[in-house]
């Protein structure tokens, strides 16, 4: 071990004597338990001894300073702690961790006296945090962040291993550590060994176990590792093991690849004493099984934070290269490495020393194309242990089947003569392949290394076994015509030697070329052929100039060719090995002439082949499982498929010329016949286990009794005896159906007759019916309803009356909306939850049940308020009725009984009410004009606050019809104790998306409440959070959550607090409840009082921000207004303390609409802002350019290309957005002129790297600047002058 390595593993703790034998002793012991050596230096010793100790501090890899937070920093302490910091600045490799222990009253004094610049965050003891938790935080920080780069992300995994060990019964405990190459198995095992080895009588860590046992032998390894320093020679292996039989032994076998070799060492663990621990690391899961280890820990990759930290440390990247660009680069590297520590660190070291970001990006692209040897070697060592078949399957997946359905891959590979069920499991066990959501996945690194193995076989493209790169395939297949002596000659040299090719996948998205007629002639071993277009917006242009294809390889298992340009496949092609034919959008008229052997064919997809007329040859494919002929519009016949016993899926949808199907396959599972001309279908062959047909048929004679589901049947000639097992009968939109037989003896659960406009009567309902749909029928009266009914939907029907439903205890949903002839209802079920009868002419409504949650109507006398009330366009409702419902709503959401709060939050978080507005609701509910309202929270509500109830009055335009699309966005803003702006945004629909809402003809009032809407900054219920006001702003939105235009306005609004009540909530106390401390206050009055109490210079700063700098960065604003002697930092704090502004977490100044409005009103009402600033503003007024009218502005577009290292165009720009562009590797940045708010400049530009040359930038300028180009020195000064003058 080198001295450097020793220094890295050494930690020095500096402290005062007061904490040395208490807190610091626990910290020192905790570090030792993690295998970290440490010493403690007392700063209270005299200068001579401290000078000697200073040498230890300088050599330490990490220095921990424990500062006594409850003691005044004396000069002696400060001097010695400053020397500790000086050691760190002299030794750049040393890290310093600071701890402020004790009360934090003197924290600021310590921080001001010592210079902590460039150091990590300071750990501080807290009242709510015990010393043990603080020690745990410090140890983790030292262990991962500072101790040594290789252990980043190890700490949490180490705790999981410890937990796995501790859960095992006393005896010999075993743990297997499993993971892909480079994931950190060895590092984790070393960390476990360092931490636990001191607790055992003997321990050994055998690195690269297979190699070690091969070189030294089993006997020497045991003696050397477990009995070090033993002078006597032990002649027998049994004697050596006898000496260890009574000892607690820790054995770590690292990177075991041969399970038999590992098992020979352990031999059933009989020779180990009780309490011993065996740890094996391996990338092959079968090793653990054969070694008898059942507890297996799978090592996961680093999370995003850990991965970024490791990358920046490995690359020695400094933040001065630009934080945004560094963020983008590190994210790309991390995403590519997918948390693999080896890959992240190797890529980081490869990028180390690159000074320019463009150099780093270029180097990274090269590394992706050609992975570093260290990474390739780590993965290839696993690849070399595979059998030939396993290697072929791995390479097929790496090159062709990433993300494909595992059953699809297995089917193709079985056709190739492999045994993929077994061999894919082997690849999974060796961490080369994963199966997730029934799809096959490879780590991006693993895929690229697999492809690198292919490319490394030979430099000749035609000699490679698998091809996937479009440019190389084009080179091999392209038709080249040269004219010599007036005669065309075609060269085929490129195709020679291509006998080795087994797979060819060509993406034609960006290609345009002609294929050789004999392109595939020499590819005798080609198994997999796929020519496709990954971009659906691009039409591929690949043709045969001679109009023919001479041959296809007879070894093909997969033939996937989209937009195949010829009328048939080559006649000499023998498809006996084909497993799948997938040729959508082809020009095929028929597959081939004559009879072919199709015994291996499982799937054929010829969808949207509009010229296809003949598929009779498919009858020869006796093992066929899927036929997809969707959209084959010229296909007239579908052959009798009764002998295709394995056929499961047939899709003939869109085959408009097919009029009949002679036979249905006996084992059919899905039959798609939408858009066909089929009028009749024989179902006598349908088996009991295939119970679903998806079709659009007009007649099915002779329904089988096993059939359980039919969709869109128009006529049924079957008797009820044939429908004994039918459970779902959907006759939706069967407009010709006039009657149905008595169905009382059927076992139907669902009966859908909606849209059967000619059906005017029904004789009886099935006794077990649960769902009944009668919407749009002509039925006027219905027989007795079954007691099992759960849903009754008669929307828009001709019903005049209903039987008494009081005994239907299972009925939950009743929809009678639009039943214009319905006059009376005798009673409602007691468990009813949803009731809709808007648009009816009911004379009398019975008592509503207490269980009701949703009501879309009016007239409830229930004391139990539903969750949703809708009184849309009920203008005849009296004002008192509307006010009563509003009061009920507010009462229900304002006071929630104690003990039920959490249940309501989980089960019923929202409530709503809507009704036409009345003019004097303002007086009743203290509504404020406008779309904003300020709320002051009573101190007593802080511990009982649940959420808010909101009243919003919306004005609708007269010609607006689709009110269903309208919703309200509520933005709640407040300031935390640090003056930072916090916000919650929730969106409420005025009407549910499925509700049919007529044209709204008047302003409506909506009540929304959400008990999940509770302001919080993640800091608990700290009272300082509520020191200011809470502001609510409301915006009309559509279903896409976009703001509606000015024709939709929020006229008035108000807010109520929802809290946990402790008293009676009955309606008799409603007046008392609402008279408690009014929640709404006059926003303008509160703001004006706060403004009037400001100092004059703070008033000026507020007016500047209100006029110019809302939503701008503090760092941007400060230099612009520094020229008029305003103290920005202290002024912003003053404004934030009185709730006139807020500062967001990313440093933006935030004002809500009420604050901006008041500022502008004050500004316009004053003839001067401040006498001290009058001369400055008047002097600069002439510098402000006059604004041009909008209609005279011209939008100018100019595109230029410049090198990425160019200094720019000398204009001052601010970036305001960035987004990924479809089909481009690089994102596009959006910039606006920095003088937009001072000069009204409309100039913008868009910047994107060139696709052909990443070192070039394509810049698109939109509109011209309306001011002179500033010099570098004058840019900021000009901005300041124009800002100060434009406020006047």
From Swiss-Prot:
Comment, domains: The TIR does not cause cell death, but can suppress RPS4 TIR domain-induced cell death. The TIR domain is involved in homo- and heterodimerization, but other domains also contribute to the interaction.
- Here the disulfide bonds are none
- Protein name in UniProt: Disease resistance protein RRS1
Q: Where in the numbering of this chain does the TIR domain appear?
A: 5-146
Give the SMART domains listed for this entry.
Answer: WRKY (SM00774)
Q: Which domain of life does this protein belong to? A: Eukaryota
Its Gene Ontology cellular component terms are: cytoplasm; nucleus
Subunit structure, as described in the record: Interacts with PopP2, a R.solanacearum type III effector. Interacts with RPS4.
Bilayer-crossing regions: none
Which Gene3D superfamilies is this protein grouped with? Helical domain of apoptotic protease-activating factors, P-loop containing nucleotide triphosphate hydrolases, Ribonuclease Inhibitor, Toll/interleukin-1 receptor homology (TIR) domain, WRKY domain
Q: What is its main location?
A: nucleus
Similarity annotation: Belongs to the disease resistance TIR-NB-LRR family.
Annotated PROSITE patterns: TIR (PS50104), WRKY (PS50811)
Task of the protein: Transcription factor. Interacts specifically with the W box (5'-(T)TGAC[CT]-3'), a frequently occurring elicitor-responsive cis-acting element. Also acts as a disease resistance protein involved in resistance to fungal and bacterial pathogens, including R.solanacearum, P.syringae pv. tomato and C.higginsianum. Heterodimerization with RPS4 is required to form a functional complex to recognize AvrRps4 and PopP2. Contributes to temperature-conditioned RPS4 auto-immunity.
Disordered: annotated span: 1267-1288
Q: Which organism is it from?
A: Arabidopsis thaliana
According to the entry, DNA is bound by residues in: 1202-1270
Q: Where is the composition biased (Polar residues)?
A: 1279-1288
Which SUPFAM superfamilies does this entry report, sorted A to Z?
L domain-like, P-loop containing nucleoside triphosphate hydrolases, Toll/Interleukin receptor TIR domain, Winged helix' DNA-binding domain, WRKY DNA-binding domain
> Which GO annotations describe the biological process of this protein?
defense response; signal transduction
